[in-house]
């Protein structure tokens, strides 16, 4: 694949071998993410970029594994412009970034590591699409910064299909994975609608 953009679940409330998951014990997920990053390294092209979303709670866990198996090139900051929190609202998320050697991002423009886009969670036909949905404009910007039309984008935690929609809008191909049935069908509808808008239903 030419680029990987993904936003993993936070695993709040999950159980693993009888243990309850939280940000304090993400170590129970370490084998999963070790295997995931190794697979990223296997399926991506040598010059491909990887964008991996997290927040301040997950960063300390994810970064060492990401750097070990992929090699961290930078950390991007997404300014959401608003957010929850009682002890100073956190209005940003972090994006671990890997890019192959010799690859320039936005070679014709000066690009900093701050991205400001309003939060992507919204109502569609009266229902919330996804609680951590990213704005299409943000994902499209990452895609267009690091790929060219016709390239293949992978998202292993597809959610409601934002990466797929952004790929369609920017003329890229995509592979999307999502195990939650509700989000799967939501993504399916959004993808169909995006094709009808941008490709005449192709």
Language-model region placement:
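S-adenosyl-L-methionine
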Residues: 188-202
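Core catalytic lobe of class I
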Residues: 1-185
């Amino acid at each position: 694949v030419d680029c990987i953009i993904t936003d993993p679940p936070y695993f709040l409330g999950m159980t693993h071998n009888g243990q309850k998951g939280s940000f304090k014990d993400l170590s129970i997920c370490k084998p999963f993410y070790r295997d995931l990053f190794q697979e990223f390294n296997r399926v991506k092209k040598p010059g491909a970029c990887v964008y991996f979303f997290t927040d301040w709670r997950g960063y300390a866990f994810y970064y060492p594994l990401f750097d070990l198996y992929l090699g961290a090139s930078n950390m991007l900051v997404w300014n959401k412009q608003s957010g929850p929190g009682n002890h100073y609202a956190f209005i940003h998320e972090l994006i671990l970034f890997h890019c192959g050697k010799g690859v320039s991002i936005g070679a014709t423009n000066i690009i900093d590591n701050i991205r400001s886009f309003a939060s992507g969670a919204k109502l569609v036909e009266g229902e919330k699409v996804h609680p951590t949905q990213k704005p299409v404009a943000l994902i499209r910007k990452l895609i267009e910064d690091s790929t060219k039309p016709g390239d293949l984008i992978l998202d292993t935690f597809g959610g409601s299909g934002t990466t797929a929609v952004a790929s369609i809008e920017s003329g890229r191909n995509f592979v999307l994975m999502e195990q939650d049935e509700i989000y799967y069908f939501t993504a399916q509808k959004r993808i169909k609608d995006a094709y009808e808008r941008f490709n005449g239903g192709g």
